[in-house]
Amino acid sequence: MTRECAPPTPGSGAPLSGSVLAEAAVVFVVVLSIHAAVWDRYSWCAVALAVQAFYVQYKWDRLLQQGSAVFQFRMSANSGLLPASVVMPLLGLVMKERCQAAGNPYFERFGIVVAATGMAVALFSSVLALGITRPVPTNTCVISGLAGGVIIYIMKHSLSVGEVIEVLEALLIFVYLNMILLYLLPRCFTPGEALLVLGGISFMLNQLIKRSLTVVESQGDPLDFFLLVVVVGMVLMGIFFSTLFVFMDSGTWASSIFFHLMTCVLGLGVVLPWLHRLIRRNPLLWLFQFLFQTETRVYLLAYWCLLATVACLVVLYQNAKRSSSESKKHQAPTITRKYFHFIVVATYIPGIILDRPLLYVAATVCLAVFIFLEYVRYFRIKPLGHTLRSLLSLFLDERDSGPLILTHIYLLLGMSLPIWLVPRPCTQKGSLGGARALVPYAGVLAVGVGDTVASIFGSTMGEIRWPGTKKTFEGTMTSIFAQIISVALILIFDSGVDLNYSYAWILGSISTVSLLEAYTTQIDNLLLPLYLLILLMA
């Protein structure tokens, strides 16, 4: 979450506005840093992709200003194509490097497939923008065509036939998800956010299908499949109910009972058998044994339940204040919204230090609960639908302009993705050394500490504003300082972290991501942890 009151709309300035150029400059610093660290043909592809995305981004911005985009996108931000386009490719590159260093060829190839899939979906988004822009932007088409040609040529000679098919399958899923979800969820995403979120879901769905078809008789590691099945199951459930409630009123008791019954049927009849096929054991029994395997896990679960209770009490207290307020449009102040960031930090740090597998599973379960409650709120499912609408409306901001409220889900994703995306098979011989030891803390540092401190200090004491934004220099500087202090505390309390004198890279990574937070208009809860993860893992 950001600290500005109301970010400028795309139409409030020229396409080549200073804030957009500054955001692009920060992104190119990240891309070139990873290119210098990796320096192979795949990193050259990432540079080419960033160059063409930089030019195509302005076509998307113009389409949004003119209202000529195919779907209804969120209007309180620019398109965000450039920062979103390079995330999956860069993530794949750094995963490849880490697994190559660990001597794991399977996951080294997996990283290349991640990078290739990210480039494919990014090129599709660029082609879509160029295809609907009138008049046809000849120069931009030439640049995009040259970059795309280089990427396709290199990938053609680097990927096996099976890997090419895998990338094309993920691209096909991405195209269909774009048509379905962007139609069902108008104004929920910018083009860049749609690329990032739907690209990730498409890749996960394709991986789940692949692993379901190639599962062997031996038991699989449940942690490798639990997240895939839960995320894909919740997305498919949402598509199913969205289609169903087109033909019936979702707010009646009959529809609500049907919703709960079908949720049980889909969960017990589809999701659990699917997970059972993958892990070759009873999923519920495995989950119960996993959660209560050690005494430490029991204490952690009790502690997390206490924090969840505190979060619920904060929501109820703020709504009680609104009820007694004279203004019916009372909104929670910035500091109040940041309470949840503090609660999440207090949740994740003990989990990262004491039991990361438990945190991995608990975050997955929490994500499923958040998505399910959002379905209940969105479809007005009785008995909680209207209550959730009233309670959560207090915490809305300009980014919740669509039918879904996604900021709390993005916060959970931003904190959890560094846990989920750490290449565990490539770190089994020992923890990551140097700056890479901080990878699991990327969400805590970027969002839990950095964004929270920047928002509070920027909104209360900030006076010097960054050009073209409502973000402040004081907020950014205090954000960097707070993250440095947090790194020092992590060194004290987590004995498994050994930075190996990589302090300059850590400081540069934190500063770069803090500058990105100052200029981006995208969902920073999701974007910032991914960029910090990429830089720390490089």
Swiss-Prot record:
Enzyme class, first EC level, given as a word: transferase
UniProt GO cellular component terms: endoplasmic reticulum membrane
Q: Which UniProt keywords apply?
A: Endoplasmic reticulum, Kinase, Lipid metabolism, Membrane, Transferase, Transmembrane, Transmembrane helix
Main location (coarse class): endoplasmic reticulum
Listed under GO biological process in this entry are: dolichol metabolic process; dolichol phosphate mannose biosynthetic process; dolichyl monophosphate biosynthetic process; protein mannosylation; protein N-linked glycosylation
**What metabolic or biological pathway is this protein involved in?**
Protein modification; protein glycosylation
A single Gene Ontology molecular function, please? Answer: dolichol kinase activity
Q: What membrane topology was assigned to this protein in its record?
A: Multi-pass membrane protein
According to UniProt, the reaction catalysed is:
a di-trans,poly-cis-dolichol + CTP = a di-trans,poly-cis-dolichyl phosphate + CDP + H(+)
State whether keyword Kinase applies. yes
Q: Which residues lie on this side of the membrane: Lumenal?
A: 1-18, 96-111, 156-163, 210-224, 276-297, 355-359, 423-436, 494-495
The record's InterPro entries line, in alphabetical order, gives:
Polypren_kinase
Q: Which EC number(s) are documented for this chain?
A: 2.7.1.108
Q: Quick one: where's region CTP-binding?
A: 459-474
Please give the residue ranges for the topological domain Cytoplasmic: 40-74, 133-134, 185-188, 246-254, 319-337, 381-401, 458-472, 517-538
Signal peptide annotation? none
Q: Per the similarity annotation, which family is this?
A: Belongs to the polyprenol kinase family.
What is the protein name given in its UniProt record? Dolichol kinase
Q: What is the organism field in this record? A: Bos taurus (Bovine)
